[in-house]
């Protein structure tokens, strides 16, 4: 059974890495959006391997079913033209320095991390614990997020129902 989990974990991780590289390097934004959905599915598979079934289902419903579809609708509404990319006005010195700095931090974190951890057994049903934390410790953040989503929904409805303004010449 452990060999199946190791293979599944390696396959899902490879899918995540290849999908992320495709999102970054593909010239078509539509293909990049579809690959982002594949990355979200692979991440849900990782959650299933970690016995977090509810989080995996929420990942698929929220990120694949809502966020990724929203990104695809935005791409279709904007209708990106196949214009050639602009040339950089200046050399990418600042982003290069930032990337080298982040690489240094990453190498330092990897070299100082203790990778030997004790074996961990997940709780068979962690949903009540998650619900308890969500509605006790994180109640304010949960309510603020629900208000932000409500405002975003009302704003989207107002923008979608707006009548075009006719100009007289």
Curated annotation (Swiss-Prot):
Keywords tagged on the record: Chloroplast, Membrane, NAD, NADP, Plastid, Plastoquinone, Quinone, Thylakoid, Translocase, Transmembrane, Transmembrane helix, Transport
Location of this chain's protein in the cell: Plastid, Chloroplast thylakoid membrane
GO cellular component, one term: chloroplast thylakoid membrane
Keyword Transmembrane helix belongs to the record: yes
Entry annotated with the keyword Plastid: yes
Catalytic activity: a plastoquinone + NADH + (n+1) H(+)(in) = a plastoquinol + NAD(+) + n H(+)(out); a plastoquinone + NADPH + (n+1) H(+)(in) = a plastoquinol + NADP(+) + n H(+)(out)
Bilayer topology: Multi-pass membrane protein
Membrane spanning residue stretches: 7-27, 29-49, 58-78, 90-110, 139-159
Subunit structure: NDH is composed of at least 16 different subunits, 5 of which are encoded in the nucleus.
Official protein name in the record: NAD(P)H-quinone oxidoreductase subunit 6, chloroplastic
Species whose genome carries this gene: Nephroselmis olivacea (Green alga)
Gene this chain is encoded by: ndhG
């Amino acid at each position: 059974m452990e060999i199946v989990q190791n293979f599944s974990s390696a396959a899902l991780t490879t899918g995540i890495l290849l999908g992320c590289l495709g999102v970054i390097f593909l010239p078509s934004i539509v293909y990049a959006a579809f690959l982002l959905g594949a990355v979200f599915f692979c991440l849900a598979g990782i959650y299933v391997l970690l016995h977090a079934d509810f989080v995996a289902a929420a990942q698929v419903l929220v990120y694949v079913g809502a966020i990724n579809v929203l990104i695809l609708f935005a791409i279709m509404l904007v209708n990106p033209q196949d214009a050639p990319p602009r040339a950089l006005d200046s050399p990418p010195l600042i982003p290069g320095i930032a990337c080298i700095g982040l690489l240094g931090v990453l190498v330092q974190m990897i070299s100082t991390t203790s990778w030997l951890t004790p074996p961990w057994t997940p709780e068979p049903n962690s949903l009540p614990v998650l619900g308890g934390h969500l509605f006790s410790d994180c109640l304010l953040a949960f309510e603020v997020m629900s208000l932000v989503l409500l405002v975003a929904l009302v704003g989207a409805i107002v923008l979608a129902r707006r009548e075009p303004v006719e100009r007289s010449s």
